[in-house]
């Protein structure tokens, strides 16, 4: 799998030239699939480039949800937020081929009189212990403070494996994760 990002701005480039160069690269490297992991907000120029790439390549090309509308290709979704069940998360995409990012995630939910705030936590250190939440398929800790309640939701290798098994049963065709984060965990996915 060849993964392309839009970390560098893609605007101002010929979509035909980019598509041809990418086709040459895919053929040279014998890539079986391509993932366009584009996170920048869509604009007409970039949408046209993504559509041209999807059309030009002979292998499956997955695109992020920002670029999926109107394209006949797999959609690549970020990890399921921990406060949403996998079933609810995948429902809007039930008629599409889905590639799902696999990652050990953490999230905090801060509950105050004013409402709730959901915040992703980006850390390589994963908490341990805690309680298991059946529907969300994650573990959690709670902390009570004078003015708020803090829930820390987190994945373990076991809960991530359980989520991915559910995702595969719900029609996800591929789980994509970084070896640096997951090691050999995704070998069978």
What are these regions (language model features)?
Residues 63-85, 107-120:
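Substrate-binding cleft/loops of secretory-pathway carbohydrate-active enzymes
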Residues 46-52, 56-61, 88-110:
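Active-site region of glycoside hydrolase catalytic domains
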Residues 163-189:
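Acidic/aromatic/glycine-rich contiguous surface patches that form carbohydrate-binding/processing clefts
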Residues 36, 100, 167:
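Conserved, mostly hydrophobic/aromatic
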Residues 1-78:
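Chitinase-like catalytic core of GlcNAc-active glycosidases
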Residues 11-28, 85-86, 155-169:
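Short, acidic/polar
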Residues 95-163:
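Glycan-binding loop/region signatures in secreted carbohydrate-active enzymes
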């Amino acid at each position: 799998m060849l993964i392309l990002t839009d970390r560098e701005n893609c605007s101002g480039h010929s979509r035909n030239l980019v598509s041809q160069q990418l086709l040459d690269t895919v053929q040279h490297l014998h890539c079986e699939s391509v993932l366009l992991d584009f996170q920048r907000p869509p604009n007409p120029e970039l949408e046209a480039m993504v559509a041209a790439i999807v059309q030009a390549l002979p292998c499956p090309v997955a695109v992020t949800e920002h670029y999926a509308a109107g394209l006949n290709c797999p959609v690549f979704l970020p990890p399921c937020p921990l406060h949403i069940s996998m079933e609810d998360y995948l429902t809007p995409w039930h008629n599409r081929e889905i590639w799902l990012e696999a990652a050990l995630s953490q999230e905090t939910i801060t509950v105050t009189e004013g409402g709730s705030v959901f915040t992703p936590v980006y850390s390589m250190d994963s908490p341990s212990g805690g309680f298991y939440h059946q529907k969300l398929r994650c573990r959690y800790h709670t902390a009570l403070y004078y003015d708020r309640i803090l829930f820390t939701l987190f994945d373990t290798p076991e809960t991530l494996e359980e989520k991915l098994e559910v995702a595969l049963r719900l029609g996800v065709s591929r789980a994509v994760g970084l070896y640096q984060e997951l090691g050999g965990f995704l070998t069978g996915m």
